[in-house]
Amino acid sequence: MILKLVHCLVALTGLIFAKPYQQQQAVLAPSQDVPLRDIHIGDINFIHTTDTHGWLGSHLSQNDYDADWGDFVAFVDILREKILQQSRDVIVIDTGDKRDGNGLSDATWPPGLRSSEIFNMMDYDLLTLGNHELYTAESAILEYRGTSQSSKFKDKYVCSNVEFIEDDGTRVPFGNKYITFETPIMKQRVLALSFLFSFQRANNRAIVTPPLEEITQKSWFQNMVETKREEEIDLIIVFGHLPATDPTEREMHKIHALIRKYYPNTVIQYFGGHTHIRDFVQLDSKSTCLQSGRFAETVGFLSINMTDPVDAESPIFSRRYIDFNKEAFKYHLSKLGHDSNVPVSTKKGKTISRLVNDLRHELNLNEKLGYIPQTYYVSTRPLNSEENLYHLITHKILPNLIPPKNYEPSMSRFILINTGSVRYDLYKGPFTKDTEYIVMPFNNDWRFITVPLVVASRVETYLNKGPVIASLGIPSSSHHKQHFGGFQKCPFINNPNLSEGYTTEDDFGCHGDDTPHNSQREYDIPNVVQCKEVKKVQEEEADPSKMVHVIFYSFMELDILNAVNSIINDLGLRMENLTTNDCSHYGGDSTKKLLRDYFSQF
């Protein structure tokens, strides 16, 4: 009798160690007795957001991030007013990626159609785009015409290395190449530039030039440094959608090296994004870079005292990562105003909160599709844990993939998905329409190829040794955190009075987070995970030459073919290289639909 063994595996590709985690959302509300760390006001103060990805309506299952966009706008408006009253300057900045990740942005077409209007109600002083504004032509058109060229932001939108393609094919700058302005209080003369990382998947309505190529080969930059001389500039702001820490490409550091040649003594402040982490890097004695997390979990705050009273040549930098919640907002406003009863809401903020709530109801995002009986984590539980989301998908979800035509019960199969298709932890509670957009927003088509078992059994390992498989999922951030040195410098926090959350280590140490949290351990995520079904009692009893199905997302086809052909050649098998002609449509529900169906039973 043939028995079916479902053996769903996830490979750690040798990365089986865990390390303290700075990127996990809180599970419990913090104790009201936990003292927060203050922000420090300087000559120039910055409020920074990045990678909000449509999270304008707060985190409904996480108390530590219970503020919505209206609460945030009110916080910024009141904070700005109080800092200006102290005769200090405030600059509010965003560095892109405003869609793909939440129903408020993604339940419309194009994504961001309605959420962009709400996002733009924040009075940003400087803003730019991210790669998620460029995946489709519709998104690029919406961003360019609705934000970049809007009357509110036309003089504040900077994008130094991206061009928009008009209907007639004309190429125009997506935003200003640079802008200059003078701060209202301290009268600091500011030069601002912005760069998107070397993104090569833009649509046919946008062109991205790699930052270094833009700087070294385009005439505008040379004209800028000739007309905006160092003696005429007090501060340079370089903000953009690229990581503060990137050991592989080091684009931020290379940009800094080039700009520093022309402005050797000017204070240069960078603001980054893309890799979804809290980070702060000191580039030299007069330059730092702040990166402020993701998903409206973090408000980045930075201050600069332009001259140190002891050392007039060195500015003083101070950073703080503020948890995106009402209590934190109230705390910082009350400390700044020396008034525990300081108002934390405004008429404008309440209007925005109402608009967010109305949009949620209009898009039916609260529609209950099922129930999640426990919380599942992407990376803060080991891959073999029943609390790990990939473990759930490979053991409980993918085995339910039954296509109407190509399923052969007697045929062994390997079902592979890229881990980037899963965007967020899955929290205990109602499984709603919004949950789908948050955790797994993208539909997929299944393809398959027939290969010998000896080849199929090696595909996962091969892919997990290679580069990140491109998708619209979250960017892989593990290689961007190598500079933390395993977080060995900062203690692992385990305090019963604290909730789990961000415990960030950066170039300034271990106390950048405004709210103390317990540390979590992060387990590295491979490129792919797989569900393996071998139709034998034991896999080792199976004939290695027996043909099996390898099933995968359609956009992974070239990666799969590369893996299969390399394995065939390495094993010396007498087979010709396989091509796209050897791949076929498999059919069946998307992983998104399979996930919904699974939780509908609860």
Report the location of each language-model feature.
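Compact beta-rich and alpha/beta scaffold cores in large eukaryotic transport/transcription complexes
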Residues: 234, 256, 285-289, 299-301, ...
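Acidic, metal/ion-coordinating pockets
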Residues: 19-312
